[in-house]
Structure formats: C-alpha cells, structure tokens
Amino acid sequence: MKNQIVIISLILCMILLSFCKKGGSEPTPDPIVPDPVLPKINITIDKSTKYQTIDGFGFFGAADVWWAGAGSLWNDAWGEKVISDLGITIWRNEIFPPSIAGANQDADWAKQKPVVQGLKEKADKYNLNLKFIATVWSPPADLKWECNFSWAGDLAATRNAGAVSTKNGGTLNPNKYTEYADWLKSNIQLYKDAGVDLYGLSLQNELMFRQTFNSCMYTSAWFNEMANTVVPKIKANYPNVKIFGAENMLDMEGKDENWSVFYHSGIKKSVTTTANIDILAVHGYSDGIAASSGSALAKMWTNHAAQFSTPMNKQAWMTETSGYVDAWEKTGDKPGALNLAMDIHSGLYFGNMSAWVWWQGSQGTMNEFSLMNGTTTGKKYSVSKQFYRYIRPGAVRVKSTSSDQDFFVTAFLNTAKGTHTIVIINSGSADKAVSIKGNDLPTTFKMYRTNSGTENCTYIKDVNSGVSNSFAVPAKTIVTLQAGGDAL
C-alpha cells in the first residue's frame, strides 16, 4: 500500500512538472488590447514632394487688450504659457500713432515695451527666434488727407486736404511719403533699442475699410504708389525687415469673382511693387469682422496660390482672423474650434500658407476674439496648439493624401530639428482606423489629440507607422503625430 502511495505521488509530481515546463510557471503577459475593429483608411506621406516652408504661427497683442491697464498686459506665467505650451513663433503688434485731441490711443511704446521685452526674454530662454511683426492701422493724423472711393480700382477716387483724424479712415497725404517712412523707421528703431530686430512690417491694416478705430484707406493705385516710395527708404536703413501686405480680406483676394480686381492683383501688375512687397498677407474675414470659414476657403486659397503667391514667388501669410466661438462645433452662424482646425488646414494645404496669426491672443474674458483669458484656455487654444506647438519654423510641408474624404491631413518635415509632424482631422461622424505609410518614415510617433470632451492636445499613446499597423482616430477630432523629439 505504501509503495502504491509513493508511485501515485511520483506520477502526480511528473504531471505537475510537465505542466510547468509548458509555461505554467512563467509570467503571463498582459493581453494586447487592440483598437476597436473600425473601418480602415490609409494616409500616404510622400517626402519627395515638397511645398512651402513654415515661418510660424502666432497671435496679436498682450495678456489683455491694449486699452486695458498697463499692469494687466504682462505677467510671467502668461509669457511662459504662450511660448512653452501654446508654442507661438510669431507675435503681431500695432504701431500706434500719437494721440491727438479727440482721438486718444489705446497704447504707446512705453505701454508696449514691457510686453515686447518679456516675450523676447521668454523666447530666448527656449532658444526660440520669435518673429516680431508690426502693422500700421493709421499714420499720424498730420500725415493724412480726406479721401473718397468705392472700391480698390475706383478710377474716380479722390483725395484732398481736410479735417482728418487717426480714426474713421482718410488716406495718407501723397506729399508726406518721406515723413511716413521716417516715422516707420523710428518705430523699427524702438524695437531694435529694446533688443528686438523687427522681422516684418505691414504698411497698412485692412486698407479698404473706414473704421471708427484707427484706420486708413488706399485704392490699389495709391497703395502701390506709397509702397514704391516708402519701402526703399525703409530698406535703406533696415534691409532685413520684410514688408508684408496688403492685409486685405481673403474673400476679396481669393474669390473667383474678386481676385482680379483687388490689391494683390494690383501688386502683381507692377514689377516695382512686386519687388517691394516681400510677403503676400491676407486676413481671414469676409468684412473685417466675420470669420471666413468652411469649404469655400479651399477655393479661395487655391486661387490665391495659383494667381499670386506661386507665380510671384512670394510666401503667403494669414495675419488676422477671429470670430470663432469656443464651442467644439458651429453655433448658429459662428464657426467653432473644430472649424478653426479645418480652416488652418485649408490655408496650409490649399494656399501653401507659411504663417497663421490669430487676432487677440488673450484678454480679460474668453470670447470669439481671443484664444485665452490670461492662462485659462479653451478649445480654440487646444486646436491651435495642435499646429503651433509641433509645426515649427523651417518645417517643410510634404505631400499627404488620404483615402477618406472626411480626413484632412498635412505633413511636415523639419530637417534642422529632425522632426516629422502629421496633423490629421477626422471631420466625419464615424471613428476610423488609420494606417500611415510612406518611404523612410519614423517607426513610432507620439499621438496628441483634442476632442469635444476632456482631451486638450493630450498625449494619448505612441503609435506605429506602416500598412500593417493602425490606430483609432475618433469622429470629429484632431490628432497630431510627432516623431523625432520635442519640436519646441
């Protein structure tokens, strides 16, 4: 009996040992949880086909509007946020004319200088060559005349001496071009004295519109005449300052029925003015206030590239837009944050746009004109960050195609930084599984995503490229894929 017990025990031990050799004693790996089974689409990146080089992304203004108290315009936390988190690489400012009786100004250089120097210090901290650009809304009042015209090509336009202000339009006195150039040069020097080389200068903001705030108006012929006289005087002292313009509406400079009769057409017709304008700049409004948004932008940007920036060999910038609510999708007639993402895409993809500059970066309340309230951010900020933070100056857009019409894709290679960036927008109502293919792509990308919920340019996970790999892109989201380290 004892022998039988021993034999049975030995048999049980052998069975147990056999089970262990099959792996029962080895740690069991965590189960691989794949993305849900979703309809699959392909995105193809062709790095051999190259388009525009990126100059940057940014906004206008200080931590609050210029008419706010000086103490609210700069603080260290805000400066840190916009440089190291949002990732602006362009900052736009107004050159204010002197105040006169009945026409006070929101700011002067004494009020602006601490903001300029604060941003420069923050940019230097991160080895960022922040591009400072400035726009004139109105020349000094004593340099202006009255004017009257109905559109840019109005041959019956008149201008003459009269009672004028910095507000409510008027035009530059053509006998004061030298004085205007001298005034502009003195303002460029203010930046230089503060340790900043001004990167770009616009001679006039939205030159078609008579506004109750600072404004000045030009016909196409007057603008060319002014630029051809003033720019050489500026360049004689500051040859590296880039002149951008005309800062008119993309609706006017890009629509089928408009592009041939407005300012960029006038610039193109003049060999001299073409040489004097370094960068073609438009604003993303239909009338100076309402945002130009939606599918029509693709045609406007396509026209602008085909008619102007490509044949003239000029960079294209979008230097002001707003009018988007912070809701994720369109509210009434106001576009939302997801619309903003698609509109940035339109400029990059269809217009070969090199720069995108929002209107007011921050103010005391978050509204359709601002991205932030101090350091408090919303969906427009997060959507902007998907582009600003990861597509850095010097990045070159390369060819990208999608097999799904609901997916909008732009891709960028930054050789100097060794980074690859792909921005994907799923505008549709269905989640999809995405495969990224192309020659010589990084194996792994970090994925950042913004949606209508709690994701705000949030790191999701690492994903792999290649046709055998895929990752989920939920409906109505924007994703940025980044490889090669931190772009900042």
Question: What spans do the regions from the language model cover?
Answer:
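N-terminal catalytic cores of secreted or lumenal carbohydrate-active enzymes
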Residues: 40-199, 203, 211, 218-224, ...
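Noncatalytic carbohydrate-binding groove/subsite architecture in carbohydrate-active enzymes
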Residues: 177, 214-343
